[in-house]
Amino acid sequence: KSKGKKERGKAAPSIPQEARLFLSDETSFSLEWNDSFLRAYPKAHSDLFSLINAKPLRVLSAGICLGEAKGKDFIPSQELALSTALTPNAFPSVELEWEDAIKFLKKEALVLPSGIDKGYVLVRYQRLPLGFVKNLGNRANNLYPQEWRIRTGYIPEEIKLFLGR
């Protein structure tokens, strides 16, 4: 593909120093920019990625998307939040109650408890990561993907967990 006017001659942004700290085993991943998205690829599979990238194949998804560069900001991705490679304390986190977790999954606005640092915060329910919000102090912007949100108005009164045997 030919590059558009804006993209022509533009160098890839430098990799943010803190991005390596997002991964629990940073030495086993190589970081690369794919357009404005920073992706982490397992070094164990680097030969395979090189082979795939050399062919005219359309790769839908590979590695872990750590986030997106928008201007001077680096916005962490939902993939990173759900990845087992995420360092547990890489971001400030807050534990949500059932009602707030459902609000988050519906992509509704959340009000976080005071004392939480401003910036990107990992929200959890029962210690499991759900995704990121950007804490602005008086409110938090929900970064949950629009296409993944819960769209039904029905919320069960009782939580039923189905565990396999």
Which residues make up each language-model segment?
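Polybasic, low-complexity RNA-engagement segments
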Residues: K1-R165
